Amino acid sequence: MLRLCSKTEFERHADFAYELASDVTKSGYPTYCDGIKTKDMFLERARKAFACEEEQMLLFESGGRIQGFILMYWLPKDRYLSTSLFLTNTEIEEALSEFLAYAKDKFKGYDLFLGFPAENQLAVNYLERQGFACIEDDYNNTAYLEQLAPVADNKEVVKIGKENYTRFQLLHSQFEENMYWNSARLYEKLENWSIFLEEKDGEPRGAVYYT
């Protein structure tokens, strides 16, 4: 059974929720198994849901026991629906089935985007059987900056701002077909992003961008 989770309920089971978030086979994206995010960061993100009008924390119960938590958020302007937490201890297919039915009923006309690590095979396989298409397949890499050796400045790497954004757009537009963060949305929120572009012989070859 899927139902709204109160802040009191979440606080009572916060340790269990973090335990699930720390297991790559029982959680969705974004991952808390990367060695960077901490329990404090997890709790801070989860608690924000109870103060935001466009977020909900759902509680999943099965067999009379709490088995998971789903933090969902939506962007009405873009008709965009996704999750910041999808945590299930057991019965992942039941949880997904109930969540998809809930989303279909409450968010008609929205596009739903879900992310799961490949290790969560039960979730990935279930969504494939439901007709979901994988539109993005990424590696989750961790850079330990204190271990990096400085390298010489590369004049072919440029920082992107509004004045030279079209140089980055030439590259990004080749891959953005199904992305939420397409070139137009990135430009609109450019002050929140850091973008670095590598060029060779005047042609864009690759980019790093983060927020």
Where are these regions (language model features)?
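Short beta-strand micro-motifs in enzyme catalytic cores
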Residues: 56-58, 79-81, 137-142, 194-196
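Short glycine-aromatic motifs
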Residues: 15, 55, 131-134, 193
